[in-house]
Amino acid sequence: MAVVLEAKERPDKKHSTLRRIRLQGNIPGILYGKNIDNQMIFVSGAALEKTIREGGRHSLMTLKIGEKDYSVLLREIQRDPLRGNILHADFQAVDMSTEVDIDVDVRLIGEAAGEKDGGVLQQNLHQLTIRVLPANIPPSIDIDISHLQIGDTVTVGDINTGGKYEIIDDPSEVIATILPPQQEEEIHSGEQQEPGHPDAEEGRETTPES
């Protein structure tokens, strides 16, 4: 069930209006989509942050504006580069019977067998683009890596979608791999040197013993 987020219309996009909205703890935004007029809105900052935290950045939401409900996706958010708080949000109204392209987070589950043997997990992809009906958008794409040995990889093509969505990314792209353990650098070489008689350094003059 989609999370319900209440929104109100805002009169304009003047800087003074936007500033007042933010000072009141709200976030200005816009609602757009096929067959609807763009609407300038604002939502509660705390409510939006909670929705993202609990449902995920790309989850389906119900945006309630007055007596009307819209099924929406949060397509873009702008954050303050220093404080990290949300400054603006773009909501796209979607048709529940039409597939959408959306980025979904990749989550690796478990500890790889190769890690227990000293291998190093390297994750190359943290998001995948999928084509899916809005009601079937997963909160994340979970991949069990517990069986991976050193040298093993997981590619996009290895993911079982269960027929619920299509992955747009190239099937050959590597999502994660288990690298061999880093070899400890040898401190001593195999050659032995007589004490008190270091080898001559290249480019340095030496005086033969008399």
Swiss-Prot record:
Keywords: Ribonucleoprotein, Ribosomal protein, RNA-binding, rRNA-binding. Residues 179-210 are annotated as: Disordered. Residues 185-210 have a biased composition (Basic and acidic residues). GO terms for molecular function: 5S rRNA binding; structural constituent of ribosome. InterPro entries: Rbsml_bL25/Gln-tRNA_synth_N, Ribosomal_bL25/Gln-tRNA_synth, Ribosomal_bL25_b-dom, Ribosomal_bL25_C, Ribosomal_bL25_long, Ribosomal_L25_dom, Ribosomal_uL5_bac-type. This is one of the proteins that binds to the 5S RNA in the ribosome where it forms part of the central protuberance. Belongs to the bacterial ribosomal protein bL25 family. CTC subfamily. This is Large ribosomal subunit protein bL25. It comes from Geobacillus sp. (strain WCH70). The gene is rplY.
